[in-house]
């Protein structure tokens, strides 16, 4: 019996632009997050600038086209990781076109790249950042930024997740927080350390009791944006003498300290909201050889924060921080 080729035959082709619009429609039907849709759109524009004419039939794209795109990006002196980020979009798009029968089958491989090791925050830097602000002179903004840094380190959450938190998402009696907005549209309940529960209890004393209000707001009570959050962390870190200002670096630091404390990679995967163990394995490969026998808790904030803090609570003016 002759083996059948089960690959779809190449169909009458749409243009490149039409195919991409159908691809994005497919992604919306899959209920991809807006962040993912924006990612595909941005990387698509980069690929289309290289192609020049997106009104030509999609079947004109070949394996050689992709190879030329790689050379084009290399000529622009893009980093290997950036090239691979662009290629992942191209691969997802063109593989979908192959499944639809718009293209002949061919393989798209990423370029070899050394994974850059992002240096996490050091213990000295964390001690500076986690030092409680002067309760007599501190503004709401500085206090809020201190709470934000504690929250990022204490949960390992993404900045986008933090921005979408509502006051009602905290259940401090149970010691948990509900993450309603995550990268892959997942939602999950994450435990909070004792140190972070105490910090959040005090922070909520200066906030409104409305459970639907944003957890972290501007000095005027407005919803923070990703840009304003980034600026807040940038200013706060520099005010503490720390040059590193990446919000995502708190996530890497959380993972590093968790692994070094002997934490279970499978549990770390769940805590960080990763769809699989790929990223968690990278953390283990980077940090597992650095285990410290004297760590007595898995949560990094618990290791670095004194639970019994002293000093007067911050005095807020009427309506400030509400």
Regions found by a protein language model. Give the residues of each.
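Conserved catalytic core of the tyrosine transesterase superfamily
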Residues: 1-322
């Amino acid at each position: 019996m002759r083996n059948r080729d089960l690959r779809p035959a190449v169909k009458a082709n749409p243009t490149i632009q039409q195919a991409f619009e159908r691809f994005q429609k497919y992604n919306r039907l899959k209920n991809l997050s807006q962040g993912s849709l924006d990612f595909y759109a941005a990387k698509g524009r980069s690929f289309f600038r290289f192609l020049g004419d997106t009104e030509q039939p999609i079947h004109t794209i070949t394996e050689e086209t992709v190879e030329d795109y790689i050379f084009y990006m290399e000529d622009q002196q893009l980093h290997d990781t950036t090239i691979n980020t662009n290629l992942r979009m191209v691969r997802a798009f063109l593989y979908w076109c192959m499944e639809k029968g718009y293209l002949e089958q061919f393989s798209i491989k990423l370029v070899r790249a050394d994974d850059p090791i992002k240096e996490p925050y050091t213990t000295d830097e964390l001690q500076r950042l986690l030092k409680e602000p002067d309760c007599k002179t501190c503004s709401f903004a500085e206090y809020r930024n201190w709470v934000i840094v504690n929250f990022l380190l204490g949960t390992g959450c993404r900045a986008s997740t933090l921005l979408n938190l509502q006051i009602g998402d905290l259940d401090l009696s149970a010691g948990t927080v509900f993450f309603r907005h995550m990268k892959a549209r997942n939602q999950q309940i994450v435990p909070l350390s004792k140190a972070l529960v105490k910090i959040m209890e005090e922070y909520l004393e200066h906030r409104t009791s409305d459970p639907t209000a944003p957890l972290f707001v501007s000095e005027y009570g407005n919803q923070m944006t990703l840009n304003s959050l980034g600026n807040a962390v940038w200013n706060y870190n520099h005010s503490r003498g720390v040059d590193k200002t990446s919000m995502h670096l708190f996530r890497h630091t959380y993972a590093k300290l968790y692994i070094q404390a002997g934490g279970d990679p499978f549990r770390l995967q769940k805590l960080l909201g990763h769809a699989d163990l790929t990223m968690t394995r990278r953390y283990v490969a980077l940090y597992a050889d650095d285990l410290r026998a004297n760590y007595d808790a898995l949560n990094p904030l618990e290791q670095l924060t004194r639970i019994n803090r002293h000093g007067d609570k911050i005095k807020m003016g009427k309506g400030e921080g509400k």
